[in-house]
């Protein structure tokens, strides 16, 4: 008998499909994003150890006043510059994997990824 996943929402199924396709290994760290209508969150995760190495969001004290509870292109620029600052301070020698979660690679998600790529990070 076939296993049923009817208890999961479509976005949860999409997120699980995307995460299954990612290259999760010791030499790759995962950049995971989450967005809501008011905030945008980014984490750098080591899947082998199961820990978050660093994170940035619209709730950080440095950019909270600029964001004002809205997620738009300006907010994404601020969060990406904060994440680049934190990643460059870590001096990463490992490659990165971009985890878009259940979100399509358009709009704000692609703007964030391109901002990281333009700063010299490869994924």
UniProtKB/Swiss-Prot annotation:
NCBIfam families: L18_bact. Belongs to the universal ribosomal protein uL18 family. Part of the 50S ribosomal subunit; part of the 5S rRNA/L5/L18/L25 subcomplex. Contacts the 5S and 23S rRNAs. The keyword Ribonucleoprotein applies. One of its GO terms (cellular component) is cytosolic large ribosomal subunit. GO terms for molecular function: 5S rRNA binding; structural constituent of ribosome. It comes from Wolbachia sp. subsp. Drosophila simulans (strain wRi). This is one of the proteins that bind and probably mediate the attachment of the 5S RNA into the large ribosomal subunit, where it forms part of the central protuberance. The gene is rplR. GO terms for biological process: translation. It holds the Pfam family Ribosomal_L18p. Keywords: Ribonucleoprotein, Ribosomal protein, RNA-binding, rRNA-binding. This is Large ribosomal subunit protein uL18.
